[in-house]
Amino acid sequence: LRSLKSSPEAIMCNVATQSGGKSYTEHEKRLDVGLILFPDANQVQETSNQWAVGIDFGTTNSCVYFKENKENPKELEFKNRINLPYDPGTDEEEIEEVMQAHKEFVPSRIVPSPFMTILRERNYKESSAENLPFRSNFIYYVDQVLYAIQDLPDDKRPLKFNLKWDEAEQGRTKVQYFMAQTVLQTAVEAAANGVKRENLTFNFSYPEAYTANFTTSFKKVTRRAVNIGLADENYKTLEKTRFETESISSALYFAKGQEVPFVNNVVTIDIGGGTSDLSIWQDTKLLWRNSFRLAGKDVLINYLTNNLTLIKEISGNDDLLLESYQTLQSIRTNKSKLANGIELLVNSPQFGEAFKNRFSMVTGKEKGKELRDLTELTLSGILYYVSQVVNHLIESRV
């Protein structure tokens, strides 16, 4: 991979005149055979607009939002920014071929928010002191869920899940890779809209379930990722990067995004993939907040991992889901990969539609009833915990 200061005008094509097997043939021993011209890069008029960017780094999914000047926040899409030197055609197979070719780089399609929090390692790692995006790790954007599940057994280029909670030093490095690429692609979208780097500010959320040391490490890694993603050491990261707990962030979403009036008494509960984040308010005053590690993974993913046949029942006659189920069966002896595969599947639109339409049909059967009861028990436990906190606040006359 090479980073250029401007869009290239052409690519020189050369071939090895003598067969060297699988070994690399140096440039001077190759024969130049022609040029491939690139289309002109689009010219963008710079503006003085400001973008406030919010990045929600989630256990299962991550989201990117932006607020331009004083407008309401919007979800940010990563558009297809590949500058192809040829017309990929309109045939479905040709388009699919191009999309598969770019899986290991930047997708040649629109990537909406949220997208799954997954990294992939490369076979041939290009090491760099600053862990630059795309070199040895890149964000694995899930396109076809079946292809993604089929990629799980590949130990040479493993898919990395649970980045948010990996306490190892290598895990923090992977967070930096993920964040740096997210910042880079966000900056590209801003530039395409005429917004300059110096007019960007970044906001990140984190769970209060993090320890103090983990929080410090997360902030340090994330700030470094901003500088790397922007390729700008002069960017005033300390001034232009803010952090807020997920409990407060979700409360602000309800108060401002959903325009819920925070008068009298309000309890917010945000149940995510890895944590449930809670806050209690009275007359717009924050009384209490917390997060704990009881959430979606602990219920749905764990249950399906131990009761795989329920996926088949929910899938009905959907060929894609049934084939995905068979692939999951082939890796069921590896509990970690199986759980990751189920996470991929349940986050697919196909499974979401099947679950919505068919779960009510399977709740009369043993496994379906168990999952429903477990879900109700978990939610009841969260609400019981909240009620205990509320009672304590009342007794303490807070």
Residue ranges, per PLM feature:
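Gly/Thr-rich phosphate-binding beta-strand-loop-beta motif of the actin/hexokinase/Hsp70
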Residues: Q43-P73, A255-S291
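Helical "lid/coupling" subdomains associated with nucleotide-phosphate turnover
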Residues: L238-R242, L322-V398
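Conserved phosphate-binding loops in N-terminal lobes of ATP-dependent enzymes
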Residues: L1, I95-Y206, V346-V362, L383-V390
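Early-domain small/polar-rich strand-loop-helix modules and first-structured segments
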Residues: L1-K160, N306-L320
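Nucleotide/phosphate-binding catalytic cleft detector across ATP-hydrolyzing
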Residues: L1-A52, P153-V266
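Metal-dependent phosphodiester-processing active-site neighborhood
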Residues: P73, K285-S324
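Amphipathic alpha-helical scaffolding segments
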Residues: C63-P85, A180, L184-T186, F202-F204, ...
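Conserved A3 ("GATE") glycine/threonine-rich loop of ANL adenylate-forming enzymes
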Residues: T59-N61, E246-S249, T275, V299, ...
